[in-house]
Amino acid sequence: MTDITIYHNPACGTSRNTLALIRNSGIEPAIILYLETPPNREQLKALISAMGIDARALLRKNVEPYEKLGLAEERFSDEQLIEAMLNYPILINRPIVVSPLGTRLCRPSEAVLDILPDAQQGEFRKEDGEKVIDKHGNRIV
C-alpha cells in the first residue's frame, strides 16, 4: 500500500517525469488517470485547499474550453472555476501529487522532490535529457 497518489495524464511529459521521479525514490504510487476518473467536487476542493492555492491557480489555460468559456476573465469565482473543471477535467492542471509531506501541483516535475518521504535512488534525467538527480541520488540545482 502506498501513501503517495498522483493525478496523472500519461500524455503529458511533466506528468510522466513526475511519476518517474516518484518511482526513482522506490515508491510505486497510486495512479489516478484524472481525465478518465476525475475528482468529484469535494475531492477537487480538498486538493485545492491542501495545496494552499485558489482554483484559478489550478486552471489550465492552453486548452480549448478555457478560451471557449472565457475563463481568462477575472469575474469567475472559485466555485464557478471548480464547476468548469468538473465539467471539463482537461482544465485541471497536472500532475497533482498527494503525499504525507504535502500536496503539490508538480510543475516543474522536480517540485515533487519536496514532498517525497524517501530519497532518490540514483541518477535521473527528464525525458528531454536534463539531468536533475546525480548518480548518488542528490538533486542538481
Q: Which functions belong to the PLM regions below?
A:
Residues 66, 74-89:
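Thioredoxin-like thiol-disulfide oxidoreductase module
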